[in-house]
Amino acid sequence: MFISFEGIDGAGKSTIIKKLKRKLPKLYPDKKFVFTREPGGKKLKEAEKIRKILLDKKTNIDPMTETLLYAASRRVHLDSLIWPALKKGHIVISDRYVDSSYVYQGIARGLGVKVVKEINDIATSNFMPDYTFFLSISEEESIIRRHKRGKPDRLEMSSKDFFSRAYEGYFKIINSPTMADRFILVNAEENVGTILKNILNEFDKILKK
């Protein structure tokens, strides 16, 4: 089973996934969980090199090049980590996947979801998550949290308009008839304990199917 986590920057995905990394193996000792993230991937040298290029403040590339680099990194991620883990029967949980490209490059950068999807369909061999948790926060809360973090990377330094387009873009993707079924919406403006509890309840439903 492959599960991705999505959300606008500041939604708290990384924080929640760290907690799931501790909780899930204890709650389901008979299952093997593999946690990873994009761009890059757990101990994947080639994908991590691409990550450094993408997030480096000094990198100056156009949206198409950015999209192709994300797709290349994603292919390495799939081929070297995700697919081998799934073949072993493991449950793979990834912090971001193709939806991030649809939103950030397709909508916020203006390339168009159709173009970005075509590129990623080739790169991923049309491989999609079984479930996607979307951590939802308001645009205003996203701004507050991003400012608190400090030390922004290249993507995080993008304009307010860029993030506004990304925010709206996520809801376009979520409400798309071809994608809506796999999304699980989570109110990420609750306290961390409540968010974690709600997500664990959803995991319990998923893993009992």
UniProtKB/Swiss-Prot annotation:
It catalyses: dTMP + ATP = dTDP + ADP. ATP binds at residues 7-14. Keywords: ATP-binding, Kinase, Nucleotide biosynthesis, Nucleotide-binding, Transferase. Its EC number is 2.7.4.9. The keyword Methyltransferase does not apply. Gene3D superfamilies: P-loop containing nucleotide triphosphate hydrolases. GO terms for molecular function: ATP binding; dTMP kinase activity. Phosphorylation of dTMP to form dTDP in both de novo and salvage pathways of dTTP synthesis. Belongs to the thymidylate kinase family. This is Thymidylate kinase.
